[in-house]
């Protein structure tokens, strides 16, 4: 039985994944599954650089605006949703595509992650105990028990703090050392495309994108989310949102908030590139040297297909 062909487009923030993905989808009769951890949330549009209906140009997109900002979402949930969508898209004669920058989400689909089974009764007992504690106490406990995890988790990201504490108590080791077993080969016929450009060019694009976000109403978007009661939600710790809260609270100037967002976005892009290079076999394209048309042409010649595929 032939494997289902799957096109994956990855790359750092602001590199141009959206525009290229639309052109590829047109060329291969594709539908796009968003591989972004924040674009699943309704009302978090500007800060996540969510694609607009106009930008979609009629290409169907999935896993965008499916949750409220106070609802949790994980790689395990993404895996279930994405696998169902891939089969559905393919069954309708279309080419499934995953586009995004949340590496663990995408990897969970490609490499058959099996999320570790745990003692659910013990886990619930621990979670119930920790749920009664305030965030300062929770974070202090995590710092005492698992310094490495605490250094990588924001104090306001209550769900991740809870998960790290619970994992440590259950397994007596840091959640940062957790290994999720996966097979070395994918059940899909996968073509992974990576977009990149020289670091100075990418950083300049990031800086300009942040300024555009502010012009488009990022501060007002964050204020609206706060007014709806989402201030303490895990989603609000995402880059693009957490930097605006101190400005709204009167703790920093708008210029400082913008600089913080630009710096955090640049750091995130660097981490994304490192992660993708270490975790996946990718064919990279420099978007600063190649036109979208030339990239699409090269990609179309290498797209996985079965004997029944007909690409327009």
Swiss-Prot record:
Binding residues annotated for ATP, in chain numbering: 11-18
Positions of substrate binding: 13-18
Cofactor: Mg(2+)
Top-level lineage group: Bacteria
InterPro entries: Dimethylallyltransferase, IPT, P-loop_NTPase
Catalytic activity: adenosine(37) in tRNA + dimethylallyl diphosphate = N(6)-dimethylallyladenosine(37) in tRNA + diphosphate
NCBIfam families per UniProt: miaA
Name of this protein: tRNA dimethylallyltransferase
Species classification: Bacteria, Bacillati, Bacillota, Bacilli, Bacillales
Gene for this chain: miaA
């Amino acid at each position: 039985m032939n494997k289902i062909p799957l096109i994956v487009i990855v790359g750092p923030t602001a590199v141009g994944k959206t525009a290229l993905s639309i052109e590829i989808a047109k060329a291969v009769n594709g539908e796009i599954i968003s591989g972004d951890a924040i674009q699943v949330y309704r009302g978090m549009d500007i800060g996540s650089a969510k694609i607009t209906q106009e930008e979609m140009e009629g290409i169907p997109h999935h896993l965008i605006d499916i949750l409220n900002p106070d609802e949790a979402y994980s790689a395990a949930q993404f895996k279930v949703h994405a696998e169902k969508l891939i089969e559905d898209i393919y069954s309708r004669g279309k080419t499934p595509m995953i586009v995004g920058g949340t590496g663990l989400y995408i990897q969970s689909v490609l490499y058959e992650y099996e999320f570790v089974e745990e003692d659910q009764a013990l886990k619930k007992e621990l979670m119930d105990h920790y749920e009664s504690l305030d965030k300062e106490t929770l974070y202090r406990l995590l710092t005492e028990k698992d310094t490495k995890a605490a250094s990588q988790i924001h104090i306001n990201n209550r769900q991740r703090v809870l998960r790290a504490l619970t994992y440590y108590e259950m397994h007596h080791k840091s959640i940062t050392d957790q290994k999720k077993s996966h097979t070395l080969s994918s059940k899909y016929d996968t073509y992974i495309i990576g977009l990149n450009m020289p670091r100075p060019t990418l950083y300049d694009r990031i800086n300009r994108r942040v300024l555009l976000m502010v012009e488009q109403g990022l501060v007002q978007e964050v204020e609206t989310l706060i007014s709806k009661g989402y201030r303490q939600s895990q989603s609000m710790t995402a880059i693009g949102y957490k930097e605006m809260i101190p400005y709204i609270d009167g703790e920093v100037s708008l210029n400082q908030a913008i600089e913080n967002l630009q710096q955090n976005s640049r750091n995130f892009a660097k981490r994304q590139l490192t992660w993708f290079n270490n975790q996946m076999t990718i064919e990279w394209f420099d978007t600063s040297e190649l036109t979208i048309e030339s990239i699409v042409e090269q990609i179309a010649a290498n797209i996985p297909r079965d004997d029944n595929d007909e690409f327009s």
